[in-house]
C-alpha cells in the first residue's frame, strides 16, 4: 500500500501592461519580479497584437499607454477563474511577490493600493496629459479575483468610459475593493510619497529613468542596478 501525497504547486499569475515605447521597462520589471520571488511566477505581457480578436477599442489622446484600458481584460484572459495580478510596466519589484499573493482575500473582487493624492503636473512622460480623477492610480496595480470580475466582458471593456473602468463602476459596491499596503505601489516623487528604504514595489508613474528627462528621479540608481543585471551576458 502506497500513500501518495500530491503537492499542488500554485502559480502566481501576473500580467504586465506592455507599451512599445517602454520595452526596456517591461524587461527590467519582469526580471525584478523573478529575481525576488520565492514561488513560481507566470508573466504574461498584455500586448495589443496578441489580444486584438477580443480587444478592439480605439486608442484616444487620453490613453497615455497602450494598456490604459486593455488591463481590464485580465479576468477574461483568466477565463474568469482564479486570481491574477495586473501591473503597469513602469514599476520595479523589490519585494517577494509571494508575500503579496498570501494577502488574497476571497471576499473582495479586487485588492489594490488606495492612493489619496492629486498629481501636481499637467503633463507626464512623453508629454502625455496627466489626467486627474478620483481613485487615480488605483488600477495600476490590481490583485484581481477573476470570478468576481464577471462584468469585465470584452464588450464592456471595449465600450465603457475610462472613468467607468478606472473608478471601478463595474462593481456593485466599493466594499468589494480591498486595501493593500501602499508599499506595494509606491509612487515615485508624488506628493506624500517620500523616498523610503523599505518598499516592495516602486512605481515610476511620472516617468522612469529609462527616459533622459527622468534619469535622476528617486530610485533611479536602484532601477539602473536591475537594468545592468538584466542586460549582463556571461561569456
Give the role of each language-model region.
Residues 23-25, 94-96, 101-102, 119-121, ...:
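Short catalytic/ligand-binding loop motif for oxyanion handling, primarily in non-cytosolic enzymes
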Residues 104-165:
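Conserved catalytic core of nucleotide-sugar-dependent glycosyltransferases
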Residues 10-18, 37-39, 45-48, 141-235:
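A glycosyltransferase accessory/donor-loop signature
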